[in-house]
Protein backbone atom coordinates (compact mmCIF):
# COMPACT_ATOMS: atom_id res chain seq x y z
CA UNK A 1 0.00 0.00 0.00
CA UNK A 2 1.39 3.36 -1.04
CA UNK A 3 1.93 5.86 1.76
CA UNK A 4 2.44 9.59 1.57
CA UNK A 5 4.32 11.91 3.85
CA UNK A 6 3.34 15.44 4.81
CA UNK A 7 4.87 18.86 5.09
CA UNK A 8 4.09 20.65 8.31
CA UNK A 9 4.25 24.43 7.96
CA UNK A 10 4.42 26.46 11.16
CA UNK A 11 4.37 30.24 11.65
CA UNK A 12 3.13 32.81 14.18
CA UNK A 13 0.34 35.33 13.68
CA UNK A 14 -1.45 37.99 15.67
CA UNK A 15 -4.52 36.43 17.29
CA UNK A 16 -6.92 38.70 15.42
CA UNK A 17 -5.59 37.37 12.09
CA UNK A 18 -6.95 33.87 12.70
CA UNK A 19 -10.24 34.36 10.83
CA UNK A 20 -8.68 35.72 7.65
CA UNK A 21 -6.20 32.82 7.62
CA UNK A 22 -9.08 30.32 7.99
CA UNK A 23 -10.95 32.04 5.16
CA UNK A 24 -7.94 31.87 2.82
CA UNK A 25 -7.14 28.23 3.65
CA UNK A 26 -10.75 27.24 2.97
CA UNK A 27 -10.67 29.18 -0.29
CA UNK A 28 -7.54 27.26 -1.31
CA UNK A 29 -9.09 23.91 -0.37
CA UNK A 30 -6.73 23.38 2.58
CA UNK A 31 -8.49 21.87 5.59
CA UNK A 32 -5.73 20.26 7.65
CA UNK A 33 -4.64 23.02 10.01
CA UNK A 34 -4.75 24.10 13.64
CA UNK A 35 -4.24 27.22 15.75
CA UNK A 36 -2.42 26.97 19.08
CA UNK A 37 -2.52 29.60 21.84
CA UNK A 38 0.85 30.72 23.14
CA UNK A 39 0.90 30.67 26.93
CA UNK A 40 3.62 33.30 27.08
CA UNK A 41 1.90 35.66 24.62
CA UNK A 42 -1.90 35.71 24.40
CA UNK A 43 -1.79 38.09 21.45
CA UNK A 44 -0.04 35.53 19.26
CA UNK A 45 -1.09 32.16 17.86
CA UNK A 46 0.90 29.38 16.26
CA UNK A 47 -0.49 28.19 12.93
CA UNK A 48 0.16 24.59 11.89
CA UNK A 49 -0.72 23.50 8.36
CA UNK A 50 -0.28 20.00 6.93
CA UNK A 51 0.21 19.58 3.19
CA UNK A 52 0.74 16.34 1.20
CA UNK A 53 4.36 16.27 0.01
CA UNK A 54 3.43 14.84 -3.39
CA UNK A 55 1.23 17.86 -4.14
CA UNK A 56 3.52 20.63 -2.92
CA UNK A 57 6.79 21.12 -4.77
CA UNK A 58 9.25 23.93 -4.02
CA UNK A 59 7.52 26.37 -6.36
CA UNK A 60 4.09 25.70 -4.81
CA UNK A 61 5.45 26.15 -1.30
CA UNK A 62 7.11 29.42 -2.25
CA UNK A 63 3.91 30.71 -3.84
CA UNK A 64 1.95 29.74 -0.75
CA UNK A 65 4.35 31.65 1.49
CA UNK A 66 3.86 34.75 -0.68
CA UNK A 67 0.07 34.41 -0.36
CA UNK A 68 0.31 34.30 3.43
CA UNK A 69 2.72 37.24 3.58
CA UNK A 70 0.45 39.35 1.37
CA UNK A 71 -2.62 38.33 3.36
CA UNK A 72 -1.03 39.35 6.66
CA UNK A 73 0.44 42.49 5.11
CA UNK A 74 3.86 41.85 6.60
CA UNK A 75 7.44 41.83 5.38
CA UNK A 76 9.25 39.30 7.58
CA UNK A 77 12.65 37.72 7.01
CA UNK A 78 11.51 34.69 5.02
CA UNK A 79 13.86 32.14 6.52
CA UNK A 80 12.78 33.10 10.05
CA UNK A 81 9.00 33.37 9.64
CA UNK A 82 8.10 30.03 8.05
CA UNK A 83 9.22 26.69 9.45
CA UNK A 84 8.82 23.64 7.22
CA UNK A 85 9.23 20.10 8.49
CA UNK A 86 8.41 16.62 7.18
CA UNK A 87 5.94 14.38 8.99
CA UNK A 88 5.91 10.68 8.15
CA UNK A 89 2.54 9.22 7.19
CA UNK A 90 2.46 6.88 10.17
CA UNK A 91 3.15 9.79 12.53
CA UNK A 92 0.56 11.98 10.80
CA UNK A 93 -2.20 9.41 11.23
CA UNK A 94 -1.95 9.68 15.01
CA UNK A 95 -0.34 13.04 15.79
CA UNK A 96 -2.89 15.30 14.08
CA UNK A 97 -5.66 13.97 16.33
CA UNK A 98 -4.23 15.66 19.39
CA UNK A 99 -5.32 19.01 18.00
CA UNK A 100 -9.04 18.16 18.15
CA UNK A 101 -11.24 18.12 21.24
CA UNK A 102 -15.01 17.93 21.86
CA UNK A 103 -16.64 21.29 21.14
CA UNK A 104 -19.94 22.67 22.38
CA UNK A 105 -21.95 24.62 19.83
CA UNK A 106 -24.93 26.69 20.87
CA UNK A 107 -27.13 25.22 23.58
CA UNK A 108 -27.69 21.73 22.22
CA UNK A 109 -24.87 20.42 20.01
CA UNK A 110 -21.62 18.72 20.96
CA UNK A 111 -19.16 17.97 18.16
CA UNK A 112 -17.33 14.81 19.22
CA UNK A 113 -14.27 13.47 17.38
CA UNK A 114 -14.94 9.75 17.03
CA UNK A 115 -11.77 8.65 18.88
CA UNK A 116 -12.79 10.48 22.08
CA UNK A 117 -15.13 8.93 24.64
CA UNK A 118 -18.20 10.93 25.59
CA UNK A 119 -18.05 12.60 29.00
CA UNK A 120 -21.21 11.83 30.99
CA UNK A 121 -21.87 15.51 31.63
CA UNK A 122 -22.62 15.98 27.91
CA UNK A 123 -25.15 13.16 27.56
CA UNK A 124 -28.05 15.61 27.35
CA UNK A 125 -26.56 17.19 24.19
CA UNK A 126 -27.19 16.37 20.56
CA UNK A 127 -23.98 14.48 19.77
CA UNK A 128 -22.46 14.92 16.32
CA UNK A 129 -19.70 12.33 15.91
CA UNK A 130 -17.09 13.33 13.36
CA UNK A 131 -14.14 11.51 11.84
CA UNK A 132 -12.51 14.31 9.85
CA UNK A 133 -9.61 12.26 8.46
CA UNK A 134 -6.87 14.20 6.73
CA UNK A 135 -9.12 16.28 4.50
CA UNK A 136 -11.62 18.03 6.77
CA UNK A 137 -11.78 19.69 10.16
CA UNK A 138 -14.18 18.86 12.97
CA UNK A 139 -16.46 21.81 12.39
CA UNK A 140 -14.65 24.42 14.47
CA UNK A 141 -14.87 27.11 11.78
CA UNK A 142 -17.00 30.09 12.97
CA UNK A 143 -19.27 29.80 9.92
CA UNK A 144 -20.11 26.20 10.89
CA UNK A 145 -20.85 27.33 14.45
CA UNK A 146 -23.20 30.02 13.16
CA UNK A 147 -25.06 27.57 10.95
CA UNK A 148 -25.48 25.01 13.73
CA UNK A 149 -26.63 27.68 16.19
CA UNK A 150 -29.27 28.77 13.69
CA UNK A 151 -30.34 25.19 13.02
CA UNK A 152 -30.93 24.28 16.65
CA UNK A 153 -33.80 26.80 16.80
CA UNK A 154 -35.58 25.39 13.73
CA UNK A 155 -38.13 22.58 13.56
CA UNK A 156 -36.67 20.11 11.06
CA UNK A 157 -39.06 17.30 11.92
CA UNK A 158 -40.43 15.68 8.75
CA UNK A 159 -38.68 18.28 6.57
CA UNK A 160 -36.69 17.89 3.35
CA UNK A 161 -33.20 19.44 3.59
CA UNK A 162 -30.52 20.30 1.02
CA UNK A 163 -26.89 20.69 2.18
CA UNK A 164 -24.81 22.53 -0.44
CA UNK A 165 -21.04 22.06 -0.10
CA UNK A 166 -21.44 19.32 2.49
CA UNK A 167 -17.73 18.88 3.27
CA UNK A 168 -17.44 16.56 6.27
CA UNK A 169 -21.24 16.23 6.38
CA UNK A 170 -21.58 17.91 9.76
CA UNK A 171 -24.65 19.95 8.76
CA UNK A 172 -26.27 16.94 7.08
CA UNK A 173 -25.80 14.94 10.28
CA UNK A 174 -27.20 17.81 12.36
CA UNK A 175 -30.29 18.09 10.14
CA UNK A 176 -30.96 14.36 10.49
CA UNK A 177 -30.45 14.51 14.27
CA UNK A 178 -33.06 17.28 14.39
CA UNK A 179 -35.60 15.09 12.63
CA UNK A 180 -35.27 15.77 8.89
CA UNK A 181 -37.09 13.12 6.84
CA UNK A 182 -34.66 13.44 3.91
CA UNK A 183 -31.22 15.02 3.52
CA UNK A 184 -29.62 15.68 0.13
CA UNK A 185 -25.91 16.54 0.23
CA UNK A 186 -24.14 18.13 -2.74
CA UNK A 187 -20.40 18.69 -3.14
CA UNK A 188 -18.04 18.95 -6.11
CA UNK A 189 -15.29 17.02 -4.27
CA UNK A 190 -15.56 13.22 -4.13
CA UNK A 191 -13.57 13.25 -0.87
CA UNK A 192 -16.29 15.42 0.65
CA UNK A 193 -19.05 13.10 -0.55
CA UNK A 194 -17.19 10.11 0.90
CA UNK A 195 -16.66 11.98 4.17
CA UNK A 196 -20.35 12.94 4.35
CA UNK A 197 -21.39 9.31 3.87
CA UNK A 198 -18.81 8.08 6.38
CA UNK A 199 -19.88 10.50 9.10
CA UNK A 200 -23.57 9.85 8.44
CA UNK A 201 -22.88 6.13 8.86
CA UNK A 202 -20.87 6.85 12.01
CA UNK A 203 -23.80 8.67 13.62
CA UNK A 204 -26.76 6.58 12.49
CA UNK A 205 -25.34 3.18 11.55
CA UNK A 206 -26.78 3.46 8.04
CA UNK A 207 -27.28 5.85 5.12
CA UNK A 208 -31.07 5.90 5.33
CA UNK A 209 -32.59 9.29 4.52
CA UNK A 210 -29.33 10.51 2.92
CA UNK A 211 -28.88 11.15 -0.80
CA UNK A 212 -25.53 12.42 -2.10
CA UNK A 213 -24.70 14.14 -5.37
CA UNK A 214 -21.22 14.73 -6.77
CA UNK A 215 -20.80 17.84 -8.92
CA UNK A 216 -21.36 21.58 -8.94
CA UNK A 217 -24.62 22.70 -7.38
CA UNK A 218 -26.04 24.38 -10.47
CA UNK A 219 -25.34 21.29 -12.61
CA UNK A 220 -26.67 18.83 -10.01
CA UNK A 221 -29.92 20.75 -9.56
CA UNK A 222 -30.66 20.75 -13.28
CA UNK A 223 -29.59 17.16 -13.92
CA UNK A 224 -31.50 15.64 -11.01
CA UNK A 225 -34.42 18.09 -10.91
CA UNK A 226 -33.99 18.63 -7.18
CA UNK A 227 -36.80 20.82 -5.87
CA UNK A 228 -39.38 21.47 -3.15
CA UNK A 229 -36.91 21.67 -0.28
CA UNK A 230 -38.11 22.97 3.08
CA UNK A 231 -34.61 24.08 4.05
CA UNK A 232 -31.37 24.75 2.20
CA UNK A 233 -28.06 24.89 4.11
CA UNK A 234 -25.23 26.66 2.30
CA UNK A 235 -21.96 27.03 4.22
CA UNK A 236 -19.55 28.08 1.49
CA UNK A 237 -17.71 31.21 0.37
CA UNK A 238 -19.68 34.33 -0.55
CA UNK A 239 -18.25 34.55 -4.06
CA UNK A 240 -19.63 31.09 -4.80
CA UNK A 241 -22.96 31.77 -3.09
CA UNK A 242 -23.72 34.71 -5.37
CA UNK A 243 -23.87 32.51 -8.47
CA UNK A 244 -26.09 29.94 -6.74
CA UNK A 245 -28.89 32.17 -5.46
CA UNK A 246 -31.17 31.95 -8.55
CA UNK A 247 -31.16 28.13 -8.47
CA UNK A 248 -31.47 28.03 -4.69
CA UNK A 249 -34.65 30.07 -5.08
CA UNK A 250 -35.97 27.58 -7.65
CA UNK A 251 -35.35 24.51 -5.51
CA UNK A 252 -37.08 25.93 -2.41
CA UNK A 253 -40.77 25.25 -1.85
CA UNK A 254 -43.01 28.21 -1.03
CA UNK A 255 -42.21 29.39 2.51
CA UNK A 256 -38.98 27.38 2.36
CA UNK A 257 -35.92 28.82 4.10
CA UNK A 258 -32.23 29.04 3.28
CA UNK A 259 -29.33 29.53 5.68
CA UNK A 260 -26.17 31.06 4.21
CA UNK A 261 -22.92 30.96 6.13
CA UNK A 262 -19.25 31.26 5.13
CA UNK A 263 -19.77 35.00 4.55
CA UNK A 264 -17.41 37.64 5.90
CA UNK A 265 -19.06 40.59 7.64
CA UNK A 266 -17.72 42.85 4.93
CA UNK A 267 -19.60 40.79 2.31
CA UNK A 268 -23.00 40.39 3.97
CA UNK A 269 -24.60 43.57 2.62
CA UNK A 270 -23.86 42.53 -0.95
CA UNK A 271 -25.33 39.06 -0.37
CA UNK A 272 -28.46 40.53 1.25
CA UNK A 273 -28.93 42.85 -1.73
CA UNK A 274 -28.76 39.90 -4.16
CA UNK A 275 -31.20 37.89 -2.04
CA UNK A 276 -33.76 40.69 -2.13
CA UNK A 277 -33.27 41.08 -5.89
CA UNK A 278 -34.22 37.41 -6.27
CA UNK A 279 -37.39 37.70 -4.16
CA UNK A 280 -35.98 36.09 -1.02
CA UNK A 281 -37.16 37.73 2.19
CA UNK A 282 -34.46 38.46 4.76
CA UNK A 283 -35.25 36.78 8.09
CA UNK A 284 -32.17 37.16 10.26
CA UNK A 285 -28.46 38.00 10.33
CA UNK A 286 -26.14 36.73 13.05
CA UNK A 287 -22.39 37.22 13.41
CA UNK A 288 -19.45 35.52 15.05
CA UNK A 289 -16.09 37.25 15.01
CA UNK A 290 -15.53 38.27 11.35
CA UNK A 291 -18.24 36.00 9.94
CA UNK A 292 -21.95 36.37 9.19
CA UNK A 293 -24.83 33.93 8.83
CA UNK A 294 -27.90 35.00 6.85
CA UNK A 295 -31.31 33.31 6.75
CA UNK A 296 -33.96 34.11 4.16
CA UNK A 297 -37.33 32.79 3.02
CA UNK A 298 -39.15 32.23 -0.26
CA UNK A 299 -42.56 33.90 -0.31
CA UNK A 300 -45.68 31.75 0.07
CA UNK A 301 -47.17 33.00 -3.20
CA UNK A 302 -44.06 32.45 -5.36
CA UNK A 303 -44.31 30.49 -8.59
From Swiss-Prot:
The reaction(s) this protein catalyses: L-lysyl-[protein] + 3 S-adenosyl-L-methionine = N(6),N(6),N(6)-trimethyl-L-lysyl-[protein] + 3 S-adenosyl-L-homocysteine + 3 H(+)
Keywords annotated in UniProt: Cytoplasm, Methyltransferase, S-adenosyl-L-methionine, Transferase
Compartmental location: Cytoplasm
Gene Ontology biological process terms, A to Z: methylation
InterPro entries cross-referenced by the UniProt entry: Ribosomal_L11_MeTrfase_PrmA, Ribosomal_PrmA_MeTrfase, SAM-dependent_MTases_sf
Entry EC number(s): 2.1.1.-
Pfam assignment, any one: PrmA
GO cellular component, one term: cytoplasm
Superkingdom as given in the UniProt entry: Bacteria
Cited Gene3D superfamilies: Vaccinia Virus protein VP39 (3.40.50.150)
Any one GO molecular-function label of the UniProt entry: protein-lysine N-methyltransferase activity
Keyword Transmembrane: no
Annotated S-adenosyl-L-methionine binding sites: 144, 165, 187, 235
Function: Methylates ribosomal protein L11.
PANTHER family according to UniProt: ELECTRON TRANSFER FLAVOPROTEIN BETA SUBUNIT LYSINE METHYLTRANSFERASE
Similarity-based family: Belongs to the methyltransferase superfamily. PrmA family.
The name this protein goes by in its record: Ribosomal protein L11 methyltransferase
Lineage, highest ranks first: Bacteria, Bacillati, Cyanobacteriota, Cyanophyceae, Synechococcales
Amino acid sequence: METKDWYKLTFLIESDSEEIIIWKLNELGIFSFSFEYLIKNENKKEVNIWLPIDDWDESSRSSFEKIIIKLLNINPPKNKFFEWSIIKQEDWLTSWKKYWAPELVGNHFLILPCWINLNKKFKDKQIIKIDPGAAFGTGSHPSTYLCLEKMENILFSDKKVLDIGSGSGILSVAARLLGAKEVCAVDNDYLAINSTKSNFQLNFGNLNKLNTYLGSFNEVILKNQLEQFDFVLCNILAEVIKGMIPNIYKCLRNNGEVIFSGILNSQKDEIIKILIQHDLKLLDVSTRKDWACISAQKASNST
